[in-house]
Amino acid sequence: MKESLPITLRPNEPMSRHTSWRVGGPAQYYAEPTTPDEAMVLAAWAMTHRLPLIWVGRGTNLLVRDEGFAGVIASYRGQRWALHEHGETAELWVEAGTPMAGTARRLAAMGWAGLEWAEGLPGAIGGAIVGNAGCYGGDTASVLIDAELLLNGSERVVWPVTELGYAYRESILKRPGADGVPPLVLAGRFRLHRADPKVLMARIGAIAAERKRKTPAGSSCGSVFKNPPGDSAGRLIEAAGLKGTRVGDAEISPIHANYIVNRGQARAADILTLIELARTTVAEQFGVMLQLEVRVI
């Protein structure tokens, strides 16, 4: 496997370096392609060597098991963007590796509304498109026009938002392709409209303050579970008496029960134990089976 590639492959790369939980064993190979061509070359290389390939974002919604992953984990890092203005509206084309929150702030300062709800949202554009990220009254599905995808590791296509199967924190992009190679989001196109920059920046500031107030300190992946219909996962976990429960250095936050925080040297196994404890206890006490929002590999 020493053939020359236009992209750096890092063997036995600890995934704890690439997840916001700061846990995770080694990927057999890790790479960060920055262009569609690099992504296609990497996918072809993985298929040639019969190595499973997983595309990830910035690791802000990801738990990698302690044993790591026998294959290739790749994070697409392209960050080009272009704004096409049409009077009082605009279309933003932006690559998947671009930070979501930074994009929201940049547009708000320019007087373009549509993504200000994403202030403080961890991760990048691609992850938001895959998971239909949303908060504070907005979500990806409501402003996305279409997504540029890489299918089967070689076919570039553009799918309109109506074909992405969006639901609460769900899309068909979470499912593997027919040949086992998962789809990769290369870019998205978003619908924006003009607004007063001062009003938008005030909204950004209010959301930032609210996030700071509610978000526990420490390394975490944000909300661990999806909210069940008509209820809150955090409320259920708190009502089950699990706030502050600790396994090793992993803790169900005493501030927000839908957060599990790494207090130092937590292992993925510690976090998984707390996840299973929360699911089992809530199911036993309230008859609700919590569904994961984070991705586990």
From Swiss-Prot:
Main location: cytoplasm
Enzyme class at the top of the EC tree: oxidoreductase
PROSITE patterns in the cross-refs: FAD_PCMH
Pathway linked to the protein: Cell wall biogenesis; peptidoglycan biosynthesis
Catalytic function, reaction form: UDP-N-acetyl-alpha-D-muramate + NADP(+) = UDP-N-acetyl-3-O-(1-carboxyvinyl)-alpha-D-glucosamine + NADPH + H(+)
Essential cofactor(s): FAD
Keywords: Cell cycle, Cell division, Cell shape, Cell wall biogenesis/degradation, Cytoplasm, FAD, Flavoprotein, NADP, Oxidoreductase, Peptidoglycan synthesis
GO term, biological process aspect, one: cell wall organization
Subcellular location: Cytoplasm
EC number: 1.3.1.98
GO MF, one example: FAD binding
Protein name listed in UniProt: UDP-N-acetylenolpyruvoylglucosamine reductase
